[in-house]
Amino acid sequence: MSATPSETTTERNFFVHPQALVESTEIGRNTRVWAFAHVMRGARVGADCNIGDHAFIESGAILGNNVTVKNGVAIWDRVTIEDNVFLGPNCVLTNDLNPRAYIKKSGSTLVPTLIRENATIGANVTIVCGVTIGQYAFIGAGAVVIRSVPDFALIVGNPGRQIGWMCVCAEKLPLPAGAARDSSVTCPHCRRSFVVAPGGLSVVEEVLIGKGENQ
């Protein structure tokens, strides 16, 4: 995966609602931008993304492929969203830890945030800048994330705290948040197997989606 869009469009091969504003020339194939959304020049959006009503994507923001941006989400400069990420309605991303209206910041003075591939960010979540959200992590609605999140972790509350782990299939795993390293678990829904590793869970046995068979 790369958060760099797969295509730079020289002709329109994506959809823009008549009441949306798209100034960027880097929008991937089959992406859809809906009413009152604004994508600024210098933003990079991959293929097959869905940008909901009233979303805002600032110059310098990067979205990978197949990203879902629900209504009212704002994505700022120095925020990178990898492939297959879901951003729920009105979730909030930031890029300045100590803002003042009279202090203007840009570029390297802003704080980067990375949301890794396949993560889910619930409605009304706030993500304080400077963190990494791990792959397949699941941030519950209304949570406030103030530190980096491991792969597959389930986070809820204010401040956000880990209460468990989520499977690739988006079901909660029967494994406590504080499970020791090398602890293992199998998802009762899809039969994928995982082990606790540095940085979160690691898949040790994959399945064929929809068939429940080992590869």
PLM regions: where:
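Flexible, glycine/small-residue-enriched loop-and-beta-strand segment within the central core
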Residues: 3-18, 23-27, 32-132, 153, ...
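Conserved G/P- and acidic residue-centered "switch" motifs that form tight phosphate/ATP-binding loops
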Residues: 139, 157
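Short, intrinsically disordered terminal segments enriched in charged and Pro/Gly residues
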Residues: 149, 201-215
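Short cysteine-rich clusters marking metal-coordination/redox-active sites
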Residues: 167, 187-190
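Short, non-ligating residues that shape and space the ligands of small metal-coordination modules
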Residues: 175-176, 195-197
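Short linker/helix segments within small regulatory modules
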Residues: 176-184
